[in-house]
């Protein structure tokens, strides 16, 4: 469905209810895989685990895609009020980001003299350094700051989307090549301003420009995009299998032929990921569209309530899971029987981390006052309906409720 210049409420995107939590628990998987490598005592085991890490390193690119899609879908072609926009975001994302940044700073700091702690907490809030997963929220805030310019840019390129995507893709490949070859491995990162760039590149908006543009353009033609992925499901699955094989072959060449370090071979910012991540994005879109297209009598997809709750909880999962993973790595994982296969211990660590984070997030979002910790606003009188106050999905973890047609009661969705 092409976005039109009108003030009518736009149809609810059910597909995002699936894509958000799937991506969130995959983020948990990335971190679990990265921090449980010590369980492997063989070279082969380490290579297998790092190969899997490489294959799930698409999560940040998917988040960028979803963020741009949601923002564009809500705001493109409409008058933009910065005051209203930031009033919503201050409650939905800035407040929880600041609170969790302070909490992580407190836990990760050995001494807590008030002045030093306040200075460090402020620095971490500004840089996203309080915990390793918070960089994404900083990226989201950067996109918020340039959103009017981004929407204006989309207005200029919407008549030539494929040309714009091709140029953006080529620039992304070139950027990742230069970054991977000269900044991450070469001596450039140790000199002058490039040292700052090397440290902060993962939290810089333009590092992911292709995925933002891809999401923005997808939002302008949602119905056509949905029809396309539903029509080419077999090709999409086949393309993903080939892309996954290519990523693994590339990884093996890096470590076994070129003898590069595992950390370098598993870098998120490398050219191969520019080819792989879009394939995964299309695959996730196809899976989500298949799910959303099969509705029940209430015009909801099957299992909608389950996925809807997880989608609401996904922001909290993202924020809280590092606390749980750190505790498990210290108090549980070392005491798992060594007779258990490494794969089982890694899976259990992921399951406990993701499940615990989901449970805590759901509990928080249903609890008045505490719901603000996960960007929600529950009320004492009606915890379940309180989230109606956050009927915005213009950032990647929040979204509007279904849009009802007056007089028919039928839910519209993309």
Language-model-derived ranges and their functions:
Residues 9-13, 77-87, 152-162, 221-234, ...:
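Membrane-interface helix-boundary motifs at transmembrane edges
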Residues 14-75, 93-101, 206-207:
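Functionally critical transmembrane alpha-helices in membrane proteins and complexes, commonly lining
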Residues 25-38, 102-110, 175-181, 248-252:
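Alpha-helical transmembrane segments of multi-pass membrane proteins
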Residues 50-60, 127-139, 183-211, 248-281:
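Interfacial loop-to-helix transition and helix-capping segments at the boundaries
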Residues 53-60, 75-106, 114, 118-132, ...:
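Transmembrane alpha-helical segments and their boundary/interface "anchor" motifs
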Residues 108-112, 116-184, 199-213:
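Hydrophobic alpha-helical segments with transmembrane-like composition
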Residues 245-248, 255-368:
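Alpha-helical transmembrane segments of multi-pass integral membrane proteins
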Residues 367-405:
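Membrane-proximal cytoplasmic C-terminal regulatory module of class A 7TM GPCRs
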């Amino acid at each position: 469905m092409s976005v039109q210049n009108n003030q009518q409420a736009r149809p609810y995107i059910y597909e995002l209810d699936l894509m958000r939590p799937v991506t969130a628990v995959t983020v948990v998987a990335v971190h679990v895989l990265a921090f449980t490598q010590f369980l492997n005592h063989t070279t082969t085991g380490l290579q297998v685990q790092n190969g899997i890490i490489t294959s799930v390193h698409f999560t940040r690119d998917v988040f960028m895609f979803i963020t741009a899609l949601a923002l564009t879908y809500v705001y493109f072609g409409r008058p933009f009020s910065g005051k209203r926009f930031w009033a919503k975001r201050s409650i939905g994302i800035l407040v929880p980001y600041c609170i969790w940044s302070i909490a992580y700073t407190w836990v990760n700091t050995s001494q807590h003299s008030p002045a030093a702690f306040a200075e460090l907490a402020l620095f971490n809030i500004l840089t996203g350094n309080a915990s390793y997963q918070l960089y994404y929220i900083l990226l989201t805030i950067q996109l918020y700051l340039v959103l009017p310019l981004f929407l204006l840019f989309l207005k200029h390129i919407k008549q030539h989307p494929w040309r714009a995507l091709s140029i953006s893709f080529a620039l992304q490949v070139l950027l990742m090549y230069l970054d991977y070859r000269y900044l991450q491995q070469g001596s450039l990162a140790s000199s002058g301003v490039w040292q700052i760039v090397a440290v902060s590149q993962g939290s810089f908006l333009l590092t992911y420009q292709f995925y933002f543009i891809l999401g923005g353009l997808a939002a302008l033609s949602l119905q056509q995009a949905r029809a396309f992925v539903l029509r080419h499901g077999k090709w999409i699955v086949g393309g993903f299998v080939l892309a996954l094989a290519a990523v693994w072959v590339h990884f093996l060449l890096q470590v076994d032929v070129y003898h590069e370090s595992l950390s370098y071979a598993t870098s998120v910012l490398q050219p191969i990921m520019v080819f792989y991540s879009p394939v995964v994005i299309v695959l996730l879109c196809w899976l989500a569209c298949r799910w959303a297209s099969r509705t029940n009598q209430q015009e909801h997809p099957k299992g909608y309530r389950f996925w809807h709750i997880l989608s609401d909880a996904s922001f909290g999962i993202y924020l809280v899971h590092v606390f749980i993973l750190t505790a498990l790595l210290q108090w549980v994982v070392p005491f798992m029987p060594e007779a258990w296969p490494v794969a089982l211990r890694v899976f259990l660590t992921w399951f406990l981390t993701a499940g615990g984070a989901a449970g805590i997030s759901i509990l928080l979002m249903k609890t008045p006052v505490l719901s603000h910790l996960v960007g929600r606003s529950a009320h004492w009188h009606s915890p379940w309906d309180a989230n109606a106050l956050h009927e915005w999905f213009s950032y990647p973890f929040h979204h509007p409720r279904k849009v009802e047609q007056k007089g028919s009661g039928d839910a519209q969705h993309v």
